[in-house]
Every structure is written in structure tokens, then in C-alpha cells.
């Protein structure tokens, strides 16, 4: 597989806009907000339900995860890759195990020019 150069223009704003269009097409702002509140409650107050897949039950929680946690994970991983100088590591492929939305693997891959392979047990994942 040929190496690709890192992305020069920041794709983050366009990606977030596309996420908004995709998820707000089917749900209202209030439904996404309610999903984010329920998802946050799971993470903070009812963590025992996470192992059973409760975080991704329902379209509101899935949209909230994609719209809030996906971009947060993207920005966090991109900052880590930049701070560690990991973009200079010679990578061809990044295996993103438990990829979820794929945001973390995408952030690293965009910094390095590597391909990314996302693997997740959820059918909803990227």
C-alpha cells in the first residue's frame, strides 16, 4: 500500500458539520440533548450498565456519542500524537481495536498519512 502524506488542511470542522447534518436529519436538538444527558448519566452514575451495551441503546444516545464524544476523542488523540511526536513514526496501518466511531484512529491516521483499520464488535460502530 503506498504511503499517503499527512492531511495539510484541518478536516475537523467539515467532519463535525457532516456529523451534525447526519444526526440532526433524523433527530431534533432536544432529542440529541436528552441522549447526551442519558449517556453522561450512564458514564457517571450507572457505569455497571455500560458492559451490557447500554451506552449505544437508542438513536439519541448513539447520536450524542457521535456528536460529542467522537469529536472529543478525535481532538484528544490528535493532541497526544502531536505532543509525543508520534506523527513522525513510520506507520503504514493503524489497527484501531474497539474503534467505536473511528474518531481516535482517524485522528492518528490523518496526522501520519497511515491507513486505518477499525475493528469493533458493535454493528453501529464506524
Task: Describe each model-derived feature in a short phrase.
Residues 101-113:
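Conserved SAM-binding loop of SAM-dependent methyltransferases across substrates and taxa
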Residues 90-100:
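Conserved class I S-adenosyl-L-methionine
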